Amino acid sequence: MEPSPDAPRAGAAEEQPGPSSSASAPAPAASSNEEEGRHQSQAQQQVQEAQPQPLAQQAPAAAGLSRYESQKRRDWNTFLQYLRNHKPPLTLPRCSGAHVIEFLKYLDQFGKTKVHADGCAYFGEPNPPAPCACPLRQAWGSLDALIGRLRAAYEESGGRPESNPFAARAVRIYLREVREAQAKARGIPYEKKRKRGAAAAAAAPPVVVAPPPVVTAPDDATGTSGGAGEDDDDDEATHSGEQQDTTPAASPTTPPATSVGTTTAAATAAAAKGSAAKGSATSS
């Protein structure tokens, strides 16, 4: 018998291979690759968490950030980059005052301040008339301000104040030596900044305050008692004057009675003498 037209198709269908084991094998391999990638990403996250993060990544940037805060973040990120590029690489917990001093010396190559050497002809002159071959350095004021910002940034990033490498005694000594050396080389003495309260008090005009009266205890007692006595005398005089005004008989302007009688008798005698004289003249 000849095969029906559908027979070859059925045979062909039977001859088509089904899904082989090699085709189903990539599924477990892909899952294992995903697990390995997941483990690697977790390990990277742990390493990043262990390393100190820049201040820009620790907190979102605030709107209207001050100039000081912006400069502090830039300085902190620069220091972290210096630690990563250090040979061998350094971590922040292992950083000490000696590493901070190395960082300050590393920054001298970017300085813009001329610091004359001991053998320079312009050593100690603040305004040299001509250029010289002395190197450029970071000014002491810039280094001092930089250490202040890094010291604050270290504590803001989670560091403990007692382990702050920027507050180490060696760093303070180094800054003092740099200040003295640059003051001699440049001929510019550095003066300590006055506090704001002292500067305001010096700038304010002097306030004239009247001295308090000097009072002695015995004089005070005597004066008080004397004043009280005078007040009492004045009051008594006032009362006596009022009594004199209300009593006419006691007025000092009223003449005594005896003087009035004597004056009247004298007037009568004078009148009698005048009458007698007129009578004698008439009779004659």
From Swiss-Prot:
Cross-referenced PANTHER family: PROTEIN G1-LIKE2, PROTEIN LIGHT-DEPENDENT SHORT HYPOCOTYLS 6
Segments forming domain ALOG: 67-194
The protein, known as: Protein G1-like9
Disordered, as annotated region: 1-69, 209-284
One cellular component (GO) term of this entry: nucleus
Function according to Swiss-Prot or TrEMBL: Probable transcription regulator that acts as a developmental regulator by promoting cell growth in response to light.
Subcellular location: Nucleus
Primary subcellular site in the record, as a coarse category: nucleus
Highest taxon above the source species: Eukaryota
A GO MF label: DNA binding
Segments carrying motif Nuclear localization signal: 192-196
One Pfam family from the record: ALOG_dom
Species this protein is from: Oryza sativa subsp. indica (Rice)
Gene Ontology BP annotations: mRNA transcription; post-embryonic plant morphogenesis; response to light stimulus
Compositional bias ranges of the Low complexity kind: 13-32, 40-63, 246-284
Classification via InterPro entries: ALOG, ALOG_dom
SS bond partners: none
Family of this protein: Belongs to the plant homeotic and developmental regulators ALOG protein family.
Keywords: Developmental protein, DNA-binding, Nucleus, Transcription, Transcription regulation
